[in-house]
Amino acid sequence: LLVLLLTIVAATSVNAQKLHPLRKLQLAEMAISQLYVDTVNQQKLVEDAIRGMLKELDPHSLYSTAKETKALNEPLNGSFDGIGVQFSMVEDTLLIIQPVSKGPSEKVGILAGDRIITVADTAISGVKMERSEIMRRLRGPRGSKIKLGIKRRGVDELLYFNVTRAKIPVYSVDAYYMIRPRVGYIRIGSFGATTYAEFMKAVDTLQTQGMRDLIIDLQENGGGYLQAAVKIIEEFLQKNDLIVYTEGRAQRRMEYRATGKGRLTKGKVYVLVNEYSASAAEILAGAMQDQDRGTIIGRRSFGKGLVQRPIDFEDGSMIRLTIAHYYTPSGRCIQKPYAKGDQEDYAMDIEKRFKHGELYSADSIHFADSLKYQTLRRHRTVYGGGGIMPDVFVPLDTTQFTLLHRQIAARSLIINATLRYVDQHRQELKSRYTAFDDFYNNYTVPQSMTDSIFAEAERLKLKAYSKEECDKTLPMLKVQLKALIARDIWDMNEYYRIMNEQNRIVQKAVEIATK
C-alpha cells in the first residue's frame, strides 16, 4: 500500500498540469490519511477542506455539521419538540421565566419562578452543566415523557412533575400593539415558516382596534426565509408589481411579483431598519421603497443580498452555497461590496461605519452617480451600493446606552438583577398591578435595585465605572429594568411597549405617522 501511494503521489507531481483539481484533492486526502506521521480525524480533515474552499468565495457561503445545521434551521422552522418553558440560568440553576401558554409544562402545573433541580432524577442544578447540555436533556421526541424535580419558593420539599413533551411554537413576530390611535405597530424578529401567519394575525387584531396606518419594525432582523418576506410584501402591492428578482452566473433571472390579492393596499406604511437589518428584511424594505408604498426610517441596513442554496449531505450536514444576487425592483443590488477570502474585513464593516460617522450623520455617506436609481412610481432618487438607505435618517444615540451600560450588560448584571428581583416580588407585583397599563403608568424601579448593580460594577472594577458614568447610565438603565420586569411578568409585547418609548427610530416613525 505504501509503495502504491508513493507511486500515485509521484505520478501526481509529474502530471500536475494534467491532473483534475478534484482528483488532486482526493489524492491529498488519501495520502494524509494513509501516510501522515500521526493519527488524523478523517471527517474533520474533509470538513476543514470544505470550509477552506468556501472561505475563499464570499462571506455567506458556509458549511455546517449536522448539529450546527439543526441549530441554524430550528429558529426558522416555527416549532420544536420540548417541555415549553422560557428559562434563564441564575447561579447554576435553571429559573423558569414563563411556561409557554397552554404548553406541556403549564398543563401539569409548573409556574413562573420555579427552579428545575433534576431532570430524569439527574441533578442539573449546582453542577456547572453547559446550557446546551441542559437543553438537550429537556428536549426530546414529541409524546415522550420526562420527570422534572422542581424547587418552588415557599415550599420546602422538591415537587415532581411528569411532563409530556409536545410541539412548542417559535414565534418570529415579537410584538404588536396600537402605538398611537389609528397607528399600529408590528415588530418582526426574523422571517420563518410561520411569520406570515403571525403577521396577518397581528394585522387582524390591530384592525379591530382601529388601525389605519402601520409601522413595521425590522430593526435587528437578520432575515430568514425569502418566501415569508415575499408573502408579507404582497399584502401591500398591486397585481404584478415586482417585489424582488435574483440573478447569477448559472442562474437565470427569476422574478417575484405580487398576486394582487393583498388586503393592505391602503393606508400609510413605515418600515424601520438599522445597520443590523439584513437579507429578507432588506428585501421587504427595498420593495416598499422602490414601489413607493412605504417610508423607510432609520439607518442604512446591513447589505446582505446573496442567494444561498442549501446542499444537504446524507449525514445531516449542509453547504449553503451562494448562487445569485438579490435585486430590488429598481435594479439595486442589496449586497454590499466584499473582497473574496477576506471575511475579517467584511465582519468589521459596521465598526467602520461607526468610526467614519455614518451612524451619526447622513452627510458622511457619499454615493457615486452610478449608484443612483429611481423609484418606480414617484421617480424619487434612491441609492445602491449595498444595503437600503432610508428615506428618513435617524442617527445613533450613544448617550442612551453608555459604555458602562454596555459593560454591565455584557457581565449579565442587568438580567441577573431582574431575575432575582422578579423571583422575590412576583406575587406582590401581580397583586398590585393586575393590568399592564397600571404597571406602565405607575411602577418605578426601586433605587436599591440600581444601587446594587452599580455596586457590583464597582466590585468587578469595570473600566467604565465612575460616579459620573453611573449618573449618565441611570435613566436608560431604569427603563431597561422596567421593561425586563414587564417581560417576566407578562411577555415580549409589554417589553417593547416600554423600550419603544425610548427608541429614537420608533419615535421618529410615530412623529411622522401622527403629523
List each language-model region with its residue ranges:
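Polar, glycine-rich mid-to-C-terminal structural blocks
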Residues: A280, D292, R299, G303-L371
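Extended, small/polar residue-biased N-terminal targeting/export presequences
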Residues: Y36-I97, G143-A175, M499-V510, K515
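Amphipathic alpha-helical interaction segments
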Residues: L27, K44-D48, G52, K231, ...
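Conserved functional hotspot residues or short segments at active or partner-binding sites
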Residues: C333-I334, Y338-K515
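Cleft-lining beta-strand/loop regions that shape enzyme active-site pockets
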Residues: N15-P21, L25, E29-Q42, T65, ...
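Structural motif
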Residues: G113-R115
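Bacterial Sec-dependent N-terminal signal peptides
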Residues: L1-L19
